[in-house]
């Protein structure tokens, strides 16, 4: 149940506030109501509020997100020194969907839709010179209505205007991230491969995953469009009845 207490700071004044269970390392998160509509608020924890380094990281996320508009990317609305206000998405993360509804991805059409939308939105970011650099199941929402992908959290992104990155998640980070090397489009592509590995029947994407997660960035796909081409043309791996893997062309 959402509280009816008021909450205010220099810019935002909300009709109701509910702190969410999932919190970040440096930010608290809230579901808030503004003019009768739900929004998502990310606010620096007290120990980081007022620290210019963390304020600039929030500013980078907001200024990057605010100029982008894609149906599978969460929308950014407003910024204060210590807070960001974004679209509230009624749904669950990919991690939660896999845990709560493990049968969802056993239907091929659901897997196809998820992969297509994920690739579409990452391709959109790259076309606007933005690297996400923290692609992972916890940063991908699936809406309760229509099960659409919503990519969230541009806090680690890299752009020409903001070349400094602020972190990554080791389990989905490319080798060049872990070693402090040069990042690029293949860095996000590595994470896409690791995300595909999380799907229950990921063996259908065996060839795609193998190329995405190559140790050498130059051996990976060099664009998301290349992945889309292979997925749409059916260049995947199929598990035959004897459970051996065979490379085939699958036509829908």
Listing of model-derived features with the role each one plays in the protein:
Residues 163-177:
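Conserved activation segment of eukaryotic-like protein kinases, specifically the C-terminal portion
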Residues 81-93, 97:
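Conserved short submotifs of the Hanks-type protein kinase catalytic core
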Residues 122, 126-143:
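Catalytic-loop of the protein kinase fold
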Residues 216-219, 225-240:
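Terminal C-lobe "cap" of eukaryotic-type protein kinase domains
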Residues 114-115:
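Activation segment signature within eukaryotic-like protein kinase domains
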């Amino acid at each position: 149940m959402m509280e009816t207490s008021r909450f205010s700071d220099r810019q935002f004044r909300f009709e109701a506030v509910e702190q969410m269970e999932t919190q970040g390392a440096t930010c608290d998160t809230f579901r808030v109501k503004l003019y009768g509509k739900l929004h998502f608020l990310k606010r620096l924890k007290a120990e980081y509020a007022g620290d210019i380094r963390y304020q600039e990281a929030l500013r980078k996320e907001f200024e990057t997100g605010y100029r982008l508009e894609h149906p599978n990317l969460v929308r950014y609305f407003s910024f204060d020194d210590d807070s960001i206000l974004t679209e509230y998405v009624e749904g669950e993360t990919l991690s939660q969907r896999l845990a709560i509804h493990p049968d969802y991805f056993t239907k091929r059409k659901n897997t196809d839709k998820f992969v297509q939308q994920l690739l579409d939105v990452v391709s959109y970011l790259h076309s606007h010179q933005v690297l996400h650099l923290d692609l992972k199941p916890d940063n991908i929402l699936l809406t309760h209505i229509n099960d659409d992908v919503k990519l969230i959290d541009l806090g680690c992104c890299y752009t020409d205007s903001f070349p400094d990155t602020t972190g990554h998640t080791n389990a989905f980070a490319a080798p060049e991230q872990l070693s402090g090397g040069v990042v690029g489009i293949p860095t996000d592509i590595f994470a896409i491969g690791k995300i595909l590995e999380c799907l229950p029947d990921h063996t259908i994407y065996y060839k795609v995953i193998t190329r995405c997660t190559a140790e050498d960035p130059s051996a990976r796909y060099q664009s998301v469009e290349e992945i889309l081409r292979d997925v749409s043309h059916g260049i995947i791996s199929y598990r035959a009845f004897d459970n051996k893997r065979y490379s085939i062309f699958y036509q829908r």
